[in-house]
Amino acid sequence: MEVSLNHPASNTTSTKNNNSAFFYFESCQPPSPALLLLCIAYTVVLIVGLFGNLSLIIIIFKKQRKAQNFTSILIANLSLSDTLVCVMCIHFTIIYTLMDHWIFGDTMCRLTSYVQSVSISVSIFSLVFTAVERYQLIVNPRGWKPSVTHAYWGITLIWLFSLLLSIPFFLSYHLTDEPFRNLSLPTDLYTHQVACVENWPSKKDRLLFTTSLFLLQYFVPLGFILICYLKIVICLRRRNAKVDKKKENEGRLNENKRINTMLISIVVTFGACWLPRISSMSSLTGIMRC
């Protein structure tokens, strides 16, 4: 069976007595300054993420209730998925990094990776729906116009699909003491300790799942979004090229440009930030290295 370690502090593969795919803790433990910086970074992300996302949700659903539209509701959904990661994943990762072993039980071991995968899916599919709405509004203004009701139905479908797509993560993670069995440390510090690891029947099964996940959760959605915004940019340039423009139309074009710039920035940031994580999940071996 292939087993890979979901451990925040990367370690090299042990070569003692077997071909275990776990990590050897002695040779790759991060130095204290690096560990401190990592924990500070996680803490800042946790605080800013919680405060920023919750504030945005409150503004959209409380202060701007009458001005709600398809895009604002989907942006609130993005914030909700990010808040879920802050609540369910980040602080567990901080403690796991500091302690080098898992203390939160089997259920939380499964849930943290599951929730993170669900959050990625919810975020990317929310961006897909937003791109569709912008496309219809700008490129095909006389066609179908997504409404607030459509947004809520879309969010329901997004969450259902994301929850189903991420089930293999919940099923594959478990607790084991194997990474600690062959340590040559002169201490019993890791005796009876366990790590939260990913366990697949075979490399082929893992490769099939991670490749499918990469396509469904990252490559195909971002490609679709890119095509939508490319057509939007082309359409806006053509409209700007027209000489006969009314001032109100010009103002509307500027507003669309502002919104599109913001949404494109969100997409680019999402793609850049999640690419390392997606790539590591989709690697052939699935094993983290130094």
UniProtKB/Swiss-Prot annotation:
Main location: membrane
Transmembrane segments: 40-60, 84-104, 112-132, 151-171, 207-227, 259-279
Residues the record marks as carrying a glycan: N11
Pfam families: 7tm_1 (PF00001)
Tissue specificity statement from the Swiss-Prot or TrEMBL entry: Expressed in heart, skeletal muscle, gastrointestinal tissues, spleen, brain and adrenal glands.
Protein name listed in UniProt: Putative neuropeptide Y receptor type 6
Source organism, top-level taxon: Eukaryota
Protein function: When expressed, is unable to bind pancreatic polypeptide (PP), neuropeptide Y (NPY), or peptide YY (PYY), suggesting that either it is functionally inactive or that it may have acquired a pancreatic polypeptide-independent function.
Protein family per UniProt: Belongs to the G-protein coupled receptor 1 family.
Keyword terms of this UniProt record: Disulfide bond, G-protein coupled receptor, Glycoprotein, Membrane, Receptor, Transducer, Transmembrane, Transmembrane helix
S-S bridge residues: C109-C196
GO cellular component, one term: neuron projection
Cytoplasmic topological intervals: 61-83, 133-150, 228-258
Annotated compartments: Membrane
Extracellular face residues: 1-39, 105-111, 172-206, 280-290
Residues in coiled coil: none
Membrane topology (UniProt): Multi-pass membrane protein
GO molecular function terms attached to this record: neuropeptide binding; neuropeptide receptor activity
